[in-house]
Amino acid sequence: MIDIREIQEVVDLGTIPGAIHCPRGMLEFWASPASPYFRDYFQENRRTVVFCAGGGRSVLAVKSMEAMGFNDVAHLEAGFGGWQKAGEAIEDASQTSRWMRKPKDAS
């Protein structure tokens, strides 16, 4: 799952366990193999579920990813808010290193 909310939303509210954070403004850069910002967890033939706070940003992200050639992409219609309201598990972003940037000289 890809969490496209802004970092402050993630820090304030948490996220879905195991989700990868990609701010909406970076999605096309991180998802394009031609981009110098490409992240290898974006694979065109891998099932990808995108979510935001309420479903608005994620539905647009899905359309963008489909236009880029992603074959199996969907969004969480009710967003993180719906996930939270349903009582599903939430991960505190401060408890996992994948939410923290490493200094450029760190290995």
Where are these regions (language model features)?
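Rhodanese-like catalytic fold shared by cysteine-dependent sulfurtransferases
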Residues: 4-48, 56-107
